[in-house]
Amino acid sequence: MHRRQFIKGVALSVAAQVPLSMWAPARAAYPAKPVTILVPFAAGGAGDLLTRAIADYARNKRSIAVGVEYRPGAGATIAPSQVARAEPDGSTLGLYSVSPFLTVPHLQKVSYDTLKDFTYIAACAFIPLALYVPAESQHKDWESVLRFAKNNPGRFRWGTSGVRGVAHIAVEAALKKQDVKTTFVPFTGGAEAITAMLGGHIEAVVSADYGPHLAAGKVRLLVLTGTEKLAAYPDVPTFHQLGYPLSTEAIYGVYGPANLPADAVTYWEGVTREMMGSDEFRNVLTTVNGGPTYLSSGAFKQNVEDNYRKLGEAIADLGLKSK
């Protein structure tokens, strides 16, 4: 055998033993295609404003194509259901909101597993949830609502931005402790619920969407469902202060399907962290009465796991579990 033929034969033999994956073209650097962020609520609420702030920052500062799409309904579970089934390449992401991940799965069947089907990328904001009424309402405080409900069973109508969400469950737990009967009216988003309230169709709304309406003097806060008071409204009590069994705020962030590539996670962690220092984002937080709260992917995942179990236990203890 000639030397040239021998070398050629060895090269072919070695090549035959190399896995085909080594010859595959390298994956393009993230992001290689446009990104869509799915919002679990209708347009116009606090979640919408925060999502558009994230998308605008990424477009303007990172020069990438980012779209925002809305998937309201079904207890805010449509968006996470679609994200869970999406290709894990970072082109489909979602706005994280507490309810569809931490409460709804304990109360109804959903097509995803909160602890297994997602990559929690970064949290960026919290907004105290509140029960609020029109500014001209007869109810000046939370005690007024309880007295009215006690004397008029079922006549106090209230709604939230999503059925069986954390706001819904927290208020139901408080009302149960007070032994009063009210009428819950479901809506697909905070903006829709507020429109119904201002139109006189319901008496109150519980959501994180009150900021612009509060600033305009259209609504009055009666009680916060969390642990922290609002500095500008020190007389508004919290559920924690009143000793109610569930006290929680709304946390928002970015998530994607399970098994997202590390570079996609790092990319959006960076975008989120940078955005939180921008004047534009601070203005949005002021509009929605929110505050900054950065959680990296690892810390965000731990937060979800801890609160999923805690809220599940609380829901079961309250006898609210229907699944």
Regions found by a protein language model. Give the residues of each.
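Hinge/capping helix and adjacent helix->loop/strand transition within the periplasmic-binding protein
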Residues: 85-91, 106-188, 192, 239, ...
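A ligand-binding cleft/hinge motif common to bilobed small-molecule-binding domains
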Residues: 99-109, 175-177, 204-234, 312
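An extracytoplasmic/periplasmic, membrane-proximal ligand-sensing/linker region
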Residues: 32-34, 176-182, 262-323
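Short beta-strand->loop
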Residues: 113-123, 181-185, 211-212, 216-247, ...
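Short, cationic motifs built from Arg/Lys/His that form the positively charged side of catalytic pockets
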Residues: 3-4, 52, 70-71, 122, ...
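N-terminal (or domain-start) structured segment
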Residues: 27-117, 155, 163, 167, ...
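N-terminal twin-arginine translocation
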Residues: 1-5, 10, 14-30
